[in-house]
């Protein structure tokens, strides 16, 4: 039972920006046959509780308590009934508003809150949670399958899959394909499917079309039992502009900036949170912790970080003002993100905090004490943009743009990166990942295999949007399922098989993930072979014997007896080849077994010669190499 004194303490912390469990005091709470409703509307003239239980009339007027919070206690409501707050705003208008703390909203097009009791689940994922707490995420494989919950698959009658359906089908599919994380586009309540969830109205409510809170808990638990982590996109920078939601809640700026130019997000038709306001900080910090703790999520991907840390983001000259230092930084946004990560990591250091951010000015994954934002990982948007431009162009011109394939090696240690081939790149006329590739259908599949091998062997964690694993031809459509019928086509089926083998290869080769935070985990063999458009590099594991040699051919020309430098004399064998017939290619030769020649190549004392099929990626591994043992000589002291 929460006492009056405890409620006051919670509200004081809320007003100071330090409340981490706001859902325990604001919103709807049931105790001893009495429901208590509280809502923050500091400049409202009056607030009424309206709902099914009082025919939506003004019979239940709320009382203002402290720090702008209104309260009422009543025994009239029943579980399952709908309610809203009728707010007489500062200008005298009376507007129906959602409960910002609601755990469930009614089906669309309505937005009323549903009176619910959250399930008190007895979790059975202790083994996963324990391993996760002991794990060093930077030195383990992370391979993320990005999913939009309502468009992965549909029933034959066109109806949506729920989380219960996804538990039966998505989890075994992800496990079979070799991904070890699922990342959902936002699961929070939103009024329009076309927003994909990024126009949030309910920061504590699961989107009703996806299922119930218990179904999400069960889904996460089932994932954990299969050693699959679950991440979700979360949008703390901007919110839906709808009049019945958070926008100008009491007729004045509550959640948004008071300065109109800062509040308006014209590009997205949204409103920006005032991240410097203490009450907003409490609201968002509590939301983040709620999703991580109540649903056992393993991390959050924070959307649109650039919009939160730059005043001039998506604004023309004259549409923004400088900060107090004369710069373009949103200082409040930077401080909030540092506070967010400090809070999450203080309570749950095992949870992944991931930033979607496209600039290179602020140290996103840097330590907070050094001025960084404190995220674990950042999407490598530079790599993604460069590499997709490279693969879209005619291979004849790739030698003139070879830096697009190699430049990201220069800054790979600047942040902890995730390499995203995400939903944003396969929609709005950008074409599917497969259909971006240059040439006819066979060449497109060959280059998609090449691209995914580059992604999997390049330093950084991995993310792939659903459908790309089998080479879907059409763009992603949020209002339909993936085109699963394409798997009847031999090329698509073989592409899916290829992705399965590639993911398994990644998960089982420590050289691809064990030392990613070290400079010496990657050695460039040859990044200058522009004329033949062949790139080669080494990925190094913990032991000197544990390394892989990656060779990528970005043209359709088979390269015979091409020379590659290697670090040690001995024997090497081919362990992966993206052009093999089983994957949809035409290469049917035996796996290559190679002996070194005592000729130097670039910075290497030895070399091998091998055949590289057109548009292929080939990976070599040492079989029997001669590595001189390092001798540590102790210096005698007098």
From Swiss-Prot:
Keyword Glycoprotein annotated: no
Entry keywords, A to Z: Carbohydrate metabolism, Glycogen biosynthesis, Glycogen metabolism, Glycosyltransferase, Transferase
A GO biological-process term: glycogen biosynthetic process
GO cellular component: cytosol
UniProt pathway: Glycan biosynthesis; glycogen biosynthesis
Protein name per UniProt: 1,4-alpha-glucan branching enzyme GlgB
Higher taxonomy: Bacteria, Bacillati, Bacillota, Bacilli, Lactobacillales
GO molecular function: 1,4-alpha-glucan branching enzyme activity; cation binding; hydrolase activity, hydrolyzing O-glycosyl compounds
Annotated Gene3D superfamilies: Glycosidases, Golgi alpha-mannosidase II, Immunoglobulins
Pfam families: Alpha-amylase, Alpha-amylase_C, CBM_48
Catalytic reactions of this protein: Transfers a segment of a (1->4)-alpha-D-glucan chain to a primary hydroxy group in a similar glucan chain
Active site (record annotation): 303 (nucleophile), 356 (proton donor)
EC number: 2.4.1.18
PANTHER family for the chain: 1,4-ALPHA-GLUCAN-BRANCHING ENZYME
Domain of life, per lineage: Bacteria
Family: Belongs to the glycosyl hydrolase 13 family. GlgB subfamily.
Subunit field text: Monomer.
Record function comment: Catalyzes the formation of the alpha-1,6-glucosidic linkages in glycogen by scission of a 1,4-alpha-linked oligosaccharide from growing alpha-1,4-glucan chains and the subsequent attachment of the oligosaccharide to the alpha-1,6 position.
């Amino acid at each position: 039972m929460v006492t009056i004194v405890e409620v006051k303490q919670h509200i004081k912390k809320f007003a100071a920006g330090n409340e981490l469990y706001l859902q325990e005091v604001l919103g709807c709470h049931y105790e001893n046959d009495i429901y208590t409703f509280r809502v923050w509307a500091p400049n409202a003239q009056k607030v009424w509780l309206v709902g099914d239980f009082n025919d939506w009339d003004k019979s239940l007027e709320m009382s203002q308590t402290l720090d702008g919070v209104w309260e009422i206690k009543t025994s009239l409501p029943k579980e399952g009934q709908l309610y809203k707050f009728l707010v007489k705003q500062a200008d005298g208008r009376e507007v129906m508003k959602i409960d910002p703390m609601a755990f469930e909203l009614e089906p669309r097009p309505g937005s009323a809150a549903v009176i619910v009791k959250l399930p008190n689940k007895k979790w059975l994922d202790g083994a996963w949670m324990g391993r996760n707490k002991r794990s060093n995420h930077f030195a383990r494989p992370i391979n993320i399958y990005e999913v939009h919950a309502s468009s992965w698959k549909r029933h034959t009658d066109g109806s949506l899959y729920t989380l219960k359906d996804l538990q039966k089908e998505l989890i075994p599919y992800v496990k079979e394909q070799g991904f070890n994380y699922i990342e959902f586009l936002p699961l929070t309540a939103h009024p329009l499917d076309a927003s994909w969830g990024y126009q949030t109205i309910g920061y504590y409510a699961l989107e009703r079309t996806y299922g119930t809170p218990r179904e999400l808990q069960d889904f996460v638990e089932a994932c954990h039992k299969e050693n699959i982590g679950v991440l979700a996109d979360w949008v703390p920078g901007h919110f839906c502009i709808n009049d019945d939601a958070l926008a100008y809640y009491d007729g004045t700026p509550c959640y948004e900036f008071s300065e109109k130019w800062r509040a308006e997000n014209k590009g997205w038709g949204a409103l920006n949170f005032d991240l410097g306001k203490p009450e907003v900080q409490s609201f968002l910090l509590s939301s983040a912790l709620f999703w991580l703790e109540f649903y056992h999520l393993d991390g959050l991907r924070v959307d649109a970080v650039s919009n939160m840390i730059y005043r001039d983001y998506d604004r023309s000259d004259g549409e923004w003002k400088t900060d107090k230092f004369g710069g373009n930084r949103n200082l409040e946004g930077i401080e909030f993100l540092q506070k967010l990560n400090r809070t999450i990591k203080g309570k749950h250091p095992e949870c992944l905090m991931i930033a979607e951010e496209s600039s290179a000015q602020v140290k996103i994954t840097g330590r907070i004490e050094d001025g960084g934002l404190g995220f674990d990982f950042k999407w490598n948007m530079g790599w993604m943009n460069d590499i997709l431009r490279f693969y879209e162009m005619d291979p004849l011109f790739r030698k003139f743009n070879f830096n697009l394939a190699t430049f990201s090696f220069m800054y790979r240690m600047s942040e902890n990166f995730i390499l995203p081939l995400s939903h944003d790149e396969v929609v709005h006329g950008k074409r599917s990942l497969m259909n971006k590739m240059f040439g006819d259908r066979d060449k497109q599949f060959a280059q998609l295999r090449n691209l995914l091998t580059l992604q999997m062997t390049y330093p950084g964690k991995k993310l792939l949007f659903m459908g790309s694993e089998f080479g879907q031809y059409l763009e992603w459509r949020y209002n339909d399922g993936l085109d699963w019928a394409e798997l009847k086509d031999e090329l698509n089926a073989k592409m899916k098989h290829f992705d399965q083998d590639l993911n398994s290869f990644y998960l089982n080769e420590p050289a691809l993930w064990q030392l990613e935070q070290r400079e010496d985990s990657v050695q460039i063999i040859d990044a200058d072979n522009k004329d033949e458009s062949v790139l080669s590099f080494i990925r190094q594991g913990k032991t000197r014997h544990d390394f892989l040699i990656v060779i990528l051919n970005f043209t359709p020309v088979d390269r015979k007896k091409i020379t590659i430098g290697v670090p040690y004399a001995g024997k090497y064998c081919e362990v992966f080849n993206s052009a093999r017939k089983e994957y949809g290619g035409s290469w049917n030769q035996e796996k290559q077994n190679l002996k070194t020649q005592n000729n130097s190549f670039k910075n290497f004392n030895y070399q091998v010669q091998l055949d590289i099929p057109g548009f292929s990626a080939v990976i070599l591994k040492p079989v029997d190499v001669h590595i001189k043992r390092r001798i540590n000589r102790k210096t005698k002291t007098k």
